[in-house]
Amino acid sequence: VSFSERGKEKLTNKTKKPMPVWAMIITDVVLTAAAIGVFMLFDYVMPQSSGVKGEVIATVDSSAEGSFTLPNAADSSQAESTAQDDGEPAVTTTAPQTEKATTTLRTEQTNRKNWGNQDTADYRSDQNAISSITNGAITSEELGSASTDNAQVTVYKKSIGEGSNKITYFVADVYVTSASEIKSAFADGEFGKNIKDSVFSMAVENKALFAINGDFYGNSERSIVIRNGIKYRDDADVCVLFTDGTMQTYSPSEYDSDAVIAKGAWQAWNFGPALLDGSGNVLETFNTTKYLNSANPRSAIGCVSAGHYIFVTVDGRNEGYSKGATLSELAAIMSDEGCMSAFNLDGGKSAMMYFNNTIVNAPDGGGRDLS
């Protein structure tokens, strides 16, 4: 198709109408939303490998292997699960404890901020809640035990209270011959962001005898991350397992990365807060938020002595079965289990315990994938 010169001139001189203001505003909003959407998808959804290989900061000396003795050392060579002779789990009810958990005042710190859970403050422990655990009757059911040459695990299902106050929790009593038997795993074996997998899958892939969720390090870009003697990150409130089998918790102002690494940090978890003072006493204050201090599903790690550890998962948000535990109740449970030090791990839908090729607890909402 051809146009005359006059027609071309008319088309050339034709003035374009400007876009209405309202249309310009809508266009800008749509483009901005699209840009934010792409950023959100990339930054918060798409798996991203950090590319960080980590720095080896500790190894367990071969001479230290087997330095701790398993309770059933004579039978430890048989890697098999055990149950009651009649095939039914034992169910026992313990009377109220004669020795009550006490509280201790932690070092006073002003303007503390736990970067794993921002905008935290010091919340006083609840003496009534602590007493309800230490003076209550606990029903205990052994779910089974399993052992290898280097580890022994016995898992219990326990409950305390009734009706809307009932708490149901699971306790793994773990003995190892060396700290090297306590291992951590990344989702897909990769340190990064938005890389997630189920506790079950990670346990199976790593051939774990027992597993529990950790601190969900991928939820925060600022925290300490030490896995199997390799440091990936180090800037927050932390619980450290050392190569000698001892465990210690640190608040932000107490934590000295260089000193901890020099001591031989084997594993480190960031979430918190610390629950006990290192002598088995419930802390007088918890560095946390109001929401995290309320009754929720929980996971925690505790140390009785070098080579002897307690892992606890508390179910919650299911009235009549388990309401969940406050930090005071969780601390009292860890103290009641004989722990000297203990640390709160990621909870809520993350709280899951794996044993004998199954998730033994009832995770809130079916649980969620973790990093």
Predicted feature residues:
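Conserved, well-ordered active-site substructure
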Residues: S220-L241, F286-M340, S350-S371
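General beta-strand structural signal in soluble alpha/beta enzymes
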Residues: F210-G214, L241, T249, S341-G347
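Active-site-adjacent helix-turn-beta-strand microarchitecture at beta-sheet edges
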Residues: Y217-L292
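A short, polar/proline- and glycine-enriched secondary-structure boundary/capping micro-motif
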Residues: G192-K196, D258-A265, G320-L327
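Zymogen propeptides
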Residues: S2-D235
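Short Gly/charged-rich anion-binding patches and loops
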Residues: D197-S198, N270, E329
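Sec/Tat-exported extracytoplasmic proteins
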Residues: A203-N206, D215, S279, M334, ...
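Short, solvent-exposed aromatic-acidic interface loops
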Residues: A187-G192, E254-D256, V314-E319
